[in-house]
Regions:
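Extreme N-terminal tail/first-helix region
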Residues: 1-26
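A generic local structural motif
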Residues: 19-22, 47-48, 129-131
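Covalent nucleotidyltransferase core used to form phosphodiester bonds in nucleic acids
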Residues: 23-25, 59-72
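Short gly/pro-enriched beta-turn/loop segments at secondary-structure junctions
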Residues: 28-30, 138
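Short, well-ordered beta-strand micro-motif
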Residues: 36, 144-147
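Short, structured beta-strand-loop surface elements
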Residues: 65-143
């Protein structure tokens, strides 16, 4: 997974603003899921807004870009906290094999259209078709979220 596509330049500052807004409880940000993982080098807790896909009774996270830092931190740590609203849930993140990731990837543009549009606009996929997302299997990490 050496390939790395840069996220849009506005994404990191936008995420920082969203995290501050969430912390003070502003509007829609209150219920925004945030993944909290230790950094793989520093051990410092890293907070990343995420989209959680509910599919067939399981929850999934998708790294929106090949080489995403949070995905590398998830691989290194294996466990973290999924914070939604005032609830903090300790979770295990299990990376899916490419074949297992395909149905999750196919569902992504249908169930998480805003995240899918960001991926398209950044050049990760050419369009919003489920087949284009399925082709990301093995390039963009997909994780099953399990309660610990």
């Amino acid at each position: 997974m050496a390939e790395k596509i840069a996220p849009p330049r506005w994404l990191k500052p936008f995420n920082a603003v969203v995290l501050v807004a969430r912390r003070v409880g502003l509007g829609w940000t209150r219920e925004l899921p945030v993944l909290v993982l230790p950094g793989r080098r520093t051990g410092k807790l890293r907070h990343t807004p995420v989209s959680v896909l509910d599919l067939d009774g399981h929850r999934y996270l998708l790294a929106g870009f090949p080489g995403a830092d949070w995905a590398a931190n998830a691989r290194a740590a294996g466990v973290g906290i999924l914070a939604v609203g005032r609830r903090n849930e300790r979770v295990r993140l299990v990376e899916l094999a490419p074949a297992d990731a395909e149905p999750v990837l196919r569902a992504w543009p249908v169930r998480i259209p805003q995240g899918a549009k960001i991926m398209r606009d950044a050049g990760v996929v050419p369009d919003l078709e489920p087949d284009s997302f399925a082709a990301l299997a093995g390039r963009c990490a997909a994780f099953r979220v399990e309660a610990v």
